[in-house]
Structures are given as structure tokens and as C-alpha cells.
Amino acid sequence: EGRLATIRGLVTPVTWDDKGNVLAAAISTHFEEEYLVDDNARGEELIAFLRQRAKVSGFIIQNENGKKIISVEKYEVLED
């Protein structure tokens, strides 16, 4: 399902637990698009790189609310 794509953007936090730990991240692109990061193993690794730029490849789907979700196959943290 979905289409394979590569996006670039800032890794941003989107959900937290009661203690303020980040549970989920998104990639915010220069085009003001937000891609929620699926909670697979690679996606969870991206949480370590909050507020850094990354190039992320994976399958993109749209959920029933119209939000874009990327299931991360591979990623690369970019130098500024």
C-alpha cells in the first residue's frame, strides 16, 4: 500500500507521554507538509534526531483524517 517516496525535512515531536517523553515524530517539509512517522523500528529511531534535518525514504499513505503517514524504510540525518 502507498507510494514509495523520499522526503526531506525537520524531525519534529507530535505526541508526548505524561512525563514529557516524545512518543511519536513527524517530518515537516519546506513546503509546510507534515508526514507522521509510522511507529515501526526505523521510525522510532528517528525520535533520537528531533529538531534535526533528515532525508527519509519509505511508503506514504493517507489516513482517514487526510494526514500523511510515512512508513520509514531508511533515513539519513543531514548536516546543516
Give the predicted meaning of each segment.
Residues 2-21, 51, 58:
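Structural detector for short beta-strands of small beta-barrel domains
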Residues 62-80:
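OB-fold/S1-family single-stranded nucleic acid-binding modules
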Residues 21-37:
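OB-fold (S1/OB) nucleic-acid-binding surfaces
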Residues 5-7, 33-36, 68:
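Short beta-strand segments
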Residues 42-57:
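Short nucleic-acid-contacting surface segments enriched for D/E, G, S/T with interspersed K/R
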Residues 12-13, 39-44:
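A short, sequence-level motif marking secondary-structure junctions
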